[in-house]
């Protein structure tokens, strides 16, 4: 291991502590990523089709992300039906950015390790 790898490892652990560890699950990461990409938001059924997991699993993860202030649940009336869709908040974008930066450090570390 060289000096650069030591610095990257140190930074990986420092950045990891900046991430809300309860948010960093694959499902929550994918939800935040999808909602950051689809800026107009997505409905529950659209998220379910993308993730292919149970309604309960999606619902509990959406509820958690809503309570944390990372996403908003919005209502829209269409043909006398109330439709709900989810959008990412600024806090959600910031948390996603922290996760992506942390993952980029790990990728950099793996690249350094493979180059030896």
Language-model-derived ranges and their functions:
Residues 14-57, 85:
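N-terminal helix-turn-helix DNA-binding core of bacterial DNA-binding proteins
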Residues 33, 66, 97:
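A cross-family signal for key residues in well-ordered alpha-helices
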Residues 78-99:
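Basic, amphipathic "hinge/linker" alpha-helix immediately C-terminal to the N-terminal HTH DNA-binding motif
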């Amino acid at each position: 291991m060289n000096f650069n790898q030591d610095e990257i490892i140190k930074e990986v652990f420092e950045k990891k502590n900046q991430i809300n560890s309860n948010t960093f699950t694959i499902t929550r990461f994918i939800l935040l990523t999808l909602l950051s990409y689809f800026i107009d938001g997505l409905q529950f059924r659209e998220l379910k089709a993308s993730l292919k997991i149970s309604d309960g699993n999606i619902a509990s993860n959406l509820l958690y992300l809503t309570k944390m202030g990372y996403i908003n649940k919005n209502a829209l009336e269409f043909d006398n039906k109330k439709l709900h869709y989810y959008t990412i908040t600024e806090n959600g974008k910031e948390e996603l950015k922290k996760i992506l930066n942390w993952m980029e450090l790990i990728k950099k570390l793996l690249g350094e390790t493979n180059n030896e």
